[in-house]
């Protein structure tokens, strides 16, 4: 087992910045030691959003975006090291998810694309990087996502309590940690993605702080009913989705039949959409004793209130109360996946992704010094 000090880097679908964590990891523990949030320049965020929403660009532009994002990830890692007074030689490896700009698990040639050049990160930090985690699972017939349920199982599984872990990033995904049952996990649908896109369009704000704007609106029930009829919500697991599907274009298509709605009412309805699609999947999966929430959506008080209202009898609380930071969950997961890759251990779960087999996942980008194998 390649135990040591690992760094995890995560830039999620919400595009609010780069989360970097450091943890000591071995077969018995994941002990977080530090965290750092690195802001994403607005121009870079807008470029990534444009790509995710299908705007055409040249191969040169895509290559430049890949390089710039890799440099940003390296800056974030170096800032964390400076904060902690550490050198790159004291880190075993970095696990970097990259920025998903396209995810297409269905069809004749399933594919997924994460950018943020890992070669840049390895060269600029002097630390071995493990990245490109999703495509091996996809090559084995899986969805390539979600990958975090394996980490949820490792750190949050309880021998008796029936738990589910809900990550609300741009997309919301659910991990079913039910004693005596096979581990399953899947994307329920939009998390913060449509909420963030709509408030950005209307007010130029990155997100609806505490859900305050949405709380002042009224739910438009006919619009909600129409949105809930989208075929994705009726799909059986394994399933995954992303910004290439649930985006402003999708929302505008939904709003076409409802001209002139107050913008605040649309926000309230989108909040209810996220709460309802999550709650439906929790209940369809048999319910649980405790729903542990992580990700930025857990800070949206309106969303949490609406979710709890639809899950009477289930304790809805943060993963912080179970000992794992809700803000850092995904970055920790990719640090842990890097440890598994360097230890020669499988990182995907066929029961979650639908892959034909479990496999070591991720590509290794050696540091300038020798590879730590």
Swiss-Prot record:
Entry keyword annotation includes Membrane: no
Superkingdom in the source lineage: Bacteria
GO biological process, one term: 1,6-anhydro-N-acetyl-beta-muramic acid catabolic process
EC class of the enzyme, as a word: transferase
InterPro entries (alphabetical): Anhydro_N_Ac-Mur_kinase, ATPase_NBD
Binding annotation for ATP: 12-19
SUPFAM superfamilies: Actin-like ATPase domain (SSF53067)
Catalysed reactions listed for this entry: 1,6-anhydro-N-acetyl-beta-muramate + ATP + H2O = N-acetyl-D-muramate 6-phosphate + ADP + H(+)
EC number: 2.7.1.170
Coiled coil: none
Alphabetically ordered keywords of this record: ATP-binding, Carbohydrate metabolism, Kinase, Nucleotide-binding, Transferase
One MF annotation (Gene Ontology) recorded for this entry: ATP binding
Pathway membership: Amino-sugar metabolism; 1,6-anhydro-N-acetylmuramate degradation; Cell wall biogenesis; peptidoglycan recycling
Stated role: Catalyzes the specific phosphorylation of 1,6-anhydro-N-acetylmuramic acid (anhMurNAc) with the simultaneous cleavage of the 1,6-anhydro ring, generating MurNAc-6-P. Is required for the utilization of anhMurNAc either imported from the medium or derived from its own cell wall murein, and thus plays a role in cell wall recycling.
Stated family: Belongs to the anhydro-N-acetylmuramic acid kinase family.
Name of the protein this chain belongs to: Anhydro-N-acetylmuramic acid kinase
Organism of origin: Erwinia tasmaniensis (strain DSM 17950 / CFBP 7177 / CIP 109463 / NCPPB 4357 / Et1/99)
């Amino acid at each position: 087992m390649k135990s040591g000090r690992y760094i995890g880097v995560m830039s999620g679908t919400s595009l609010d910045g780069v989360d970097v964590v450091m943890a000591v990891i071995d077969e018995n523990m994941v002990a977080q030691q530090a965290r750092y949030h690195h802001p994403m320049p607005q121009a870079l965020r807008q470029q990534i959003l444009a790509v995710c929403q299908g705007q055409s660009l040249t191969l040169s532009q895509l290559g430049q975006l890949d390089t710039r994002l890799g440099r940003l990830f390296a800056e974030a890692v170096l800032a964390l090291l400076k904060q902690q007074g550490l050198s790159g030689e004291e880190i075993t490896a970095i696990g970097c998810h990259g920025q998903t700009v396209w995810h297409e698990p269905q069809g004749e040639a399933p594919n997924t694309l994460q950018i943020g050049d890992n070669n840049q990160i390895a060269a600029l930090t002097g630390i071995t990087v493990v990245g490109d985690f999703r495509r091996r699972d996809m090559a084995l017939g899986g969805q390539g996502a979600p990958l975090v349920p394996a980490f949820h199982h490792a750190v949050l599984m309880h021998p008796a309590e029936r738990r589910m872990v809900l990550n609300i990033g741009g997309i919301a995904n659910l991990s079913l940690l039910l004693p005596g049952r096979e581990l399953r996990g899947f994307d329920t649908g939009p998390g913060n993605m449509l909420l963030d896109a709509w408030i950005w369009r209307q007010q130029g704000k990155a997100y609806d702080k505490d859900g305050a704007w949405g709380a002042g609106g009224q739910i438009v029930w006919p619009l909600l009913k129409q949105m809930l009829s989208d075929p994705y919500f009726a799909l059986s697991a394994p399933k995954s989705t992303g910004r290439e599907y649930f985006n402003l274009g999708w929302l505008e298509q939904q709003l076409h039949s409802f001209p002139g709605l107050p913008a605040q009412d649309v926000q309230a309805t989108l909040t209810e959409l996220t709460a309802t699609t999550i709650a439906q999947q929790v209940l369809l999966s048999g319910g649980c004793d405790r729903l542990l929430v992580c990700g930025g959506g857990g800070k949206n008080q309106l969303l949490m209130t609406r979710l709890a209202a639809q899950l009477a009898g289930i304790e809805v609380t943060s993963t912080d109360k179970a000992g794992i930071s809700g803000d850092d969950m995904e970055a920790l997961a990719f640090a842990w996946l890097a440890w598994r890759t360097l230890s020669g251990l499988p990182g995907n779960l066929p029961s979650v992704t639908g892959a034909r087999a479990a496999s070591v996942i991720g590509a290794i980008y050696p540091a300038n010094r020798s590879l730590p194998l």
